Amino acid sequence: MNLSEKDILYNWHPYTQHKTAFPHPVIVKGEGVLLWDETGKEYIDAISSWWVNPFGHSNAFIANAIYKQLTTLEHVLFGGFTHEPAILLSEKLAQILPQNQKKFFYSDNGSTAVEVAFKVAMQYFYNKGEKRTKIIAFENAFHGDTFGAMAASGISFFTEAFKGSLLEVIRIPVPTPENEKEVFETFRKLVETKDYAAFIFEPLVQGAAGMVMYAPETLDELIRISKANNVFTIADEVMTGFGKTGKNFACDYLIEKPDMMCLSKALTGGTIPMAVTSFSQEVFDGFYADDTNKALFHGHTFTANPTGCAAALASISLLLTQEMQDNIQQVNMQHKAFEQRIKTNPRVKTTRVLGVIFALEIKVENEQAYYGDLRNKLYAFFIENGIILRPVGNIIYILPPYIIYHVHLEKIYSAIEKALEEVY
């Protein structure tokens, strides 16, 4: 029995209907932007393996930091103990995040980072004697697959089986020039009820919705309205964080700053599962009391794992180099050049670019399912051509590692152009 057959026998893959799925390629090696399967076939990782790998596969700098930490202190419980990597990582995050972010709580992935934020927001008001248990989120948002995060997500078939078992979440449209006045008024009426603990958002880019982009000015206004009504704001930067939007964080485009931020994915350069939720001093002070019952009773076995912290410190060190910042801008310029080239294609409805993110929407007669026929044909076409792209319905997006070469980007662009001719 080969590896592919064993995979089918034993493994349950995410977002997969196994009865109809084709066997998955067995990846055996990664280097830079390239991956190889067991047959020797080469793939360009055009989406940074679900947006986690900005510095390339098998990055020696991060790997060495991990090895050094593994042979010094691989893990120690964070309840009742602390350690240098966590202290240094929190110090570094305080330096690069918005200045109001003062305290850091570590967890395991993006979903758990969101769960922490929700629990903190609700308990903050509980500690003050207020009952605020509702959340506001954007339509078509995606915040993760655990129960709280899933409740705030807007992709209906992800949550259909769990109706009645989720947090109460009210969704508002993403603001556009056409609807922003109505959105602001609806939002204001909601927060004035004093029923809401928090407003959560993916700043500037809704990733799983198809890289839907919106203006920072509109988000600034929503944050201002939230603050005026004592509703916490949670920036879910799990996808956008660590350079993807052209700045270190999407919140760097904002005048107003969130009360909490959720970070994961690229935090460790795609090496070790880890996440962090950051908080303003005001939020932390809501738990700082003589009463033990007002403490945050939440934790994970691998909270602030030293090896993960070491990987994150190395990853942030790479991000802040001038070379990597230049790489991000270079990818952005190449995306913009491709946008000019492709947007006149009669099969293309819209295009959009921010930082290293490129997306195009294909013209279709009928609305396409998230995992519909067109998407599946496009995905199979790209895999056949050695390109890892995962279209969302009729939207094709690129989010490559920052170290990608021009020749690899051109192969991706050419594959998209070819797909528009052959798959459409």
Feature-to-residue mapping (PLM):
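Conserved N-terminal phosphate-binding loop of PLP-dependent enzymes in the Aspartate aminotransferase
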Residues: 1-424
